[in-house]
Design a protein with these regions (language model features):
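S-adenosyl-L-methionine-dependent nucleic acid methyltransferase catalytic domains
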Residues: 1-195
Length: 195
């Protein structure tokens, strides 16, 4: 069923990303376009959805490290949806480079420490322009994934307390936790939920 479909997608996408990684030149970043279906984002906060997690897992398994993400509004809000069609909700560009072959491993605690040290400045960079900010408020939850996953993916593994590698899902949850409601004032919370 669903688990077999996810495994099939992960294997196929990992193979495709391995081919891209083999052809990538270290002097240039690789950009990958990913489009979210509405069904992927319906029941999840931000971008923590199964398809997105599986796609990111394939990119990381291929040996890429993310250096950034850029959300794109490519779909019309008022698009007519036909019966049985998949409507796209939004799109995102991933910017990647090959991960260092001698990349170290870190603990969950060190990963969280790095998130807490780096994400506030990254968020400030995305919002410091006010109305003219480089990232719209509605896209912040997707955009913050770039700096967060850049930290996560630079390592060969982030190890949980039991020594097992942290999953992409857990990493995304920790990154999205930075976006928890209590981190923002009332007006910002309203805007984030409104959009």
């Amino acid at each position: 069923g669903k688990d077999k479909a996810e495994a099939f997608f992960l294997d196929g996408m990992t193979h495709a990303m391995n081919n891209v990684a083999e052809q990538a030149h270290p002097a240039f970043p690789v950009t990958i376009y990913y489009a979210f279906k509405q069904a992927e984002t319906k029941d999840h906060v931000g971008t923590s959805s199964t398809g997105w997690e599986t796609f990111l897992e394939a990119v990381l398994r291929a040996g890429f490290a993310l250096t950034g993400t850029w959300p794109m509004r490519t779909e019309r809000d008022a698009r007519s949806i036909g019966i049985g069609t998949n409507a796209l909700a939004s799109s995102i560009i991933l910017v990647c480079r090959k991960r260092a072959v001698n990349a170290p491993t870190v603990s969950r605690r060190e990963f969280i420490r790095e998130l807490n040290a780096n994400l506030p400045e990254a968020l400030l960079d995305m919002t410091r322009g006010g109305v003219n900010s480089p990232v719209a408020p509605v896209d912040l939850s997707q955009a913050i994934i770039g700096p967060g996953m850049a930290i996560f993916s630079q390592y060969a593994a982030v190890l949980e307390a039991d020594g097992q590698p942290m999953s992409v899902r857990t990493a995304l949850q920790l990154i999205n936790r930075f976006f928890a409601e209590d981190d923002f004032d009332h007006d910002t919370q309203f805007c984030l939920h409104w959009f």
